[in-house]
């Protein structure tokens, strides 16, 4: 809403009509002071009788209609969905929602008026100067008066930063605003000798990262001078990184002893600086010149723009003030405020000259020359001289690298030699010390449109411009110049999503000449490699795999068909061999036909392990021709032609590279898993193959359902590869109980309770058909009880008693049947698994020795079993080293995951405890035994929560076969399924339901809209083209939830909030809670609540101690909020954890908390922090693993994110407000009965209603009840008649489990929908959500103030979400709005 048109009232004649926008005025003259008739409470000129003079103020005290009485008409209950059959309440008193009054103190009113007045005046001034409107106007900061040049008086000069004006047609989005580049960062970079325009370009390319921008400029500068000399020598390739790091550490100690405090290691093994005192340079350039020059500049130039200094001037090149930072502001504290750890000083000691040594990650110094930079604060030293000194020093470093000698001390000595350096001072010109040459406009036919929200790509001036492919963006020249510096150097990146997204918007094509040269080199190396003994030895092993026999068939089909489906059993070699068949075939051909292959994997560990395996088979290290890329990590180089990546990484690339330019083959592995991402990728690829006839797609499945995929791609050909495995004996639960002689003890947690047995019997009776009921009654009446009695196969085992189980399992011992009859089949029995492991390790059987693979549902079960085995002397290795135990889970580090592939010493049994990650994604060769718990975590839609959740479910028959196939790789194997044979044959599904049909679709909707190819399509039309579309009702519900959250517009367009939620792989409501927690600086508590919502509540309630557990929970309660009670409990746990593990255990036991749930929440908090860091909402570079390592007890998030992100972490009212924004529209109205009164000696007193008399109603579901586990269960009075909830549970009645009271201001300021103000019976009613939520404003002024403040807040949140790097603390407009919101929520 434009601030310049907020008031439509006219100061004129009276009798105007009241409206939510103000009164309709009369025809009074604007240039006179006659008062208008006002009308119904108009704004300018006021309302009322018309006797007051018109005022130019926005609000006046006389406009305040003080209406404190509530309207007499009772509020209308919103129960439109009440079913006809619902019984009326038994009590007679009518219940109603108390209509609360929206108050605001006079002090707060004045402050809000002053704030809005300032904001609107600035907006009006900005609008009149600019003459534009819309999003561009809203997103710009507010500036002071007379900031821009008067119309027609603008000075004529070229704009500072305009290269993007030459890229693309007019509809391309406006350039990155100047606030994206800090003037302090530009000034800092320029002191290395680079011109400010080069600095600005580099900073934009590197997303404001000062260290990365410096390295980018240095490489660009040095590559033009030294070219191929910068290449890594062949000797350095084979040197280990550990050896290089050790030598650097030794040199560090030597430099510290020689240079003392002048030497500083800014970043360990990355950045060194040495302060220098070069008096001869200071004396050579007289300081008087500087003073004279600066004086002339001050006399002739306009003063510096104050908004530019703050980092954001909306007028840009039209501003009449100077966009430069004065030299006096660049020293001291201001200079150190540049937020870059690579360059910041650790203390206040400064030197006029500094030598900086920089090492990239995995740098091979001293076998490889480091980047060398000469830095000076001497403003009289010419920029060109600084660069010539840096080049001279780098040349010396290259010479030392040939002999692998340390170079830093030698460089210091060279700088102190006046005779050597003075020679360089005669060179006063350098290409990078002057502005770059203007880039010519791109011809219109080669311009390429950009997708929505795409950041502009800044071109670079390089020498490759004449070698570009047609249609390639100019920005690629810069990247290719870097790539052509030498042979393929492996780049290991921890790349954030922000940087990945920015890079993805550049074309992936490379210059034809550069690509041909690189391919020629790769072909030559491959031909040489084929002659080596090592390669031949590995090739012979590869030829033993079943996939090798189909090599010619596969290549022949690919030469004729664009899409091929390959079905192969686990272990046939399809994942490792088929990509190599394609690559090797292309390497034996001409260089211009070399393949560029991407192979997707469903999990991170798969991408890493397979890439390392394939690289080993090719007798090279990973990162050369074979690399991998996962979220936040990539190991690849310019020579990589086979890239293994996760499905999500490829989908992210598609956001900026819609047709996968430069890619020749896409291989989608494990398509049979039918994940949401893989099904969506198939839809995208089906579109791309229609556009790119040269792109080939190979789908690989480990099951025999390949026909479905073949049909989806127009009946493309299918190849079936047989598996290679030894016979595997398959056993079930009854067999496991027999061999281990396991017996359930009384009171065992794995025993079914009597209540559960009764429940199962009741369930079985309900599930019977009418015919089965008749048959059962007839059997009982005729006493048909013979030996041949049978039990129907449709009845599950858990619904049978001992006698029925005897009938079903003939030949099984009674002791086993007795155990089965009382066992809880829904639980994973860790005791039985331990007993099986003892049987296997003891070796009292005929099976050969080998590794054991145990499949468990999730990380919690893995931890429990691991700890349980550690208390068993057979497994803990305290007496003898008989076993080694490895957990395997996707959240573990790469090093921990790789340990499972290491073969143990002779006589030691390797036990791997894994989730279904080991089912198809990876192959562990030495596994002989498999224990299948029969359970897995599966994403499901939780109707109670209205969101996605991970639930324990039984595996399918296909899953069970895959798990069985993991055994028998090297010898005859054994597989124990911990479910019965009957359950396997009659209860398990043949295939799991595709994920897309059982999960909420909000995330996929957002992902579809973020892709350029689907951004303008109707969601229904896109979903209908999926291989197996979800139900239309599921899509409809997801669209409603997205609109309620503000992520999607009614016409299905993505909002800025939706854009960022699409980048967070979490439920959209949790994502919104995380974002708002970051914006309002209460991050840590917001993440704690988000982790609980995403996982589960840590409060536990044992059957025999329910009352005691509820009382303990009430001790944490305050502000009528389950979420704030959770927050208190979690804080207490963190404090106890910092004391000791024992204290943590006692705290959980005493307060009925689950320690494992709290640990899972802590892990989730760290993951959420990483995600926010990844998209730029908290400081970049935060990684969950690093946070966990640095945490000294607790989760470590508060310390990692810093005080700035948690300024309001102790403000419970603000936390509730942020929660309101995330959970809305999950609001419950509290209806209270009409008052009862009691006579007393002092008069009549109103009685509090009983808790049972309160009624709770939702907008869509009618009446609900508060769950007994909630802290609000027995509450008799709520200060506010509105509660927020997260989850509904339907049993005999509909319950809301956790809820939190929310007051007036959070609802008005953060609730969904538009705020409406209406005059009803003399009172101004503020309403939300079509009148579902209503308040009475204390006055018209209060109503309008709140409404206008809500508009400003909405706009500010949009600006922040559009630009996550915007600092609301330093932004004058943002900080004032946030402060006012916090004050109103806290004090009113």
Curated annotation (Swiss-Prot):
Stretches assigned to the Helicase ATP-binding domain: 555-722
Catalyzed reaction equations: ATP + H2O = ADP + phosphate + H(+)
Residues of the UBA domain: 175-220
Chain ranges for the short sequence motif DEVH box as given in the UniProt record: 669-672
Gene Ontology MF annotations: ATP binding; ATP hydrolysis activity; nucleic acid binding; RNA helicase activity; zinc ion binding
Positions with biased composition (Basic residues): 1-11
Residues binding ATP, per UniProt: 568-575
Root EC class: hydrolase
Start and end residues of each Helicase C-terminal domain: 832-1012
E.C. designation(s): 3.6.4.13
Residue ranges of the region described as Disordered: 1-107, 121-154
Pfam family, one: HA2_C
Cross-referenced SUPFAM superfamilies: CCCH zinc finger, P-loop containing nucleoside triphosphate hydrolases, UBA-like
ZnF C3H1-type: positions: 299-326
Annotated keywords: ATP-binding, Coiled coil, Helicase, Hydrolase, Metal-binding, Nucleotide-binding, Phosphoprotein, Zinc, Zinc-finger
Stated family: Belongs to the DEAD box helicase family. DEAH subfamily.
Function, in words: Probable ATP-binding RNA helicase.
The protein's name: Putative ATP-dependent RNA helicase DHX57
Organism: Mus musculus
Designated gene of the protein: Dhx57
